[in-house]
Amino acid sequence: LEDFIAKTNIDGFFLDTMSSLPDSFITIQKKFPSFEFASEGTPKEQRQIEQLTSSWDQIGDIRRNYKVEIEANMFRFVFPEHPLNMVSRWSVGSDKDSIIKRAAFNGMGLVIWQDVFGVWLPFNNKQKQQIKKLKNVFNKYHNIIFGSNSVPLIETLSNGLICNQFYNDNNQKIFAIYNFTNKSIKGPLVALEPIVKTKIQQIFGIKTNLQIKKIKKINT
């Protein structure tokens, strides 16, 4: 394998059906420190998490297996240095919308798998545009989204909202906010520290009128 890697200059291996790195591959990792080992299963033990460079967050039928469209992925926030890429191979239609929303809410990549063992299950044009926008956001704001100070499910100030906070060492933050209700919410979202110079912009999702206001001695 070492000879094959040296001759082909490949970037890494995908460990199909696996969630750990075989002991025989450890020497490869030592000889090629930047080599990628991505597993299909999310690792569960410390050794696996340390040795694998990334893994899939693979879910089945969203409608059947999950009661909510969006939820926080705690593994992603506990181990931000271990990229998780979301995939639901058999999802179709609006279920693919849910996968994109989950990836955006948790700051996670997507596995684009459309030809599933000969079954063609494509993303539609609108979904492809959303994925492209999300990729651009991840590239532009990578150091914030994968910041070590990120926190899942911070307190929100209106009922029906959940929020993940991505936060880097330069005090830059991204709030991923999801509305659980089927109605528009007009009101405070999250509390901000009383910083003199604060700039805010929306970078993804449904266009929203965002403002910074002081409400009851809390900058919101």
Give a label for each model feature.
Residues 1-22:
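Active-site groove signature of glycoside hydrolases
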Residues 22-198, 204:
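Active-site-proximal substrate-binding groove within the catalytic cores of carbohydrate-active enzymes
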Residues 202-212:
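A short, surface-exposed interaction/processing loop segment used at functional sites
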Residues 213-220:
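C-terminal beta-strand-rich structural cap/linker in extracellular carbohydrate-active enzymes
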